[in-house]
Amino acid sequence: MSTDHHHHDHDAHDEIPFDEKLLKLLGHWIKHNEDHALNYRKWAEKAKANGRSNAAGLLEEAADMSLTINEKFEAALDRLHRK
């Protein structure tokens, strides 16, 4: 009897096609970054209200960076849709 009796791939039948998975991930990442950007901006306002304008400015920059990353994700989505 062979000791290598369990070598088949369990995921072979359940795997999502690559393009579909990538589209879903990009959509998720875009939403995720939007949520983070909103949260960073809320905390920037709180930081300003508490005399921490220097930190607030950095939080605003982080929010902007998150949305800039989304531009790349949106471009990737566009290219995937064009195939």
Residue ranges and their predicted role:
Residues S66-L80:
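Amphipathic alpha-helical coiled-coil segments
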Residues K31-D35, A62, H81:
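Aromatic-residue detector
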Residues D19-A55:
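Short, contiguous, helix-prone interaction/anchoring segments in small proteins
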Residues H7, D78-K83:
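Short, charged, intrinsically disordered terminal tails
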Residues W29, A62-M65, I69:
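Amphipathic alpha-helix face/heptad-repeat signature
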Residues A56-E61:
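Short, charged, amphipathic alpha-helical segments
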Residues M1-P17:
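Histidine-centered metal-binding segments
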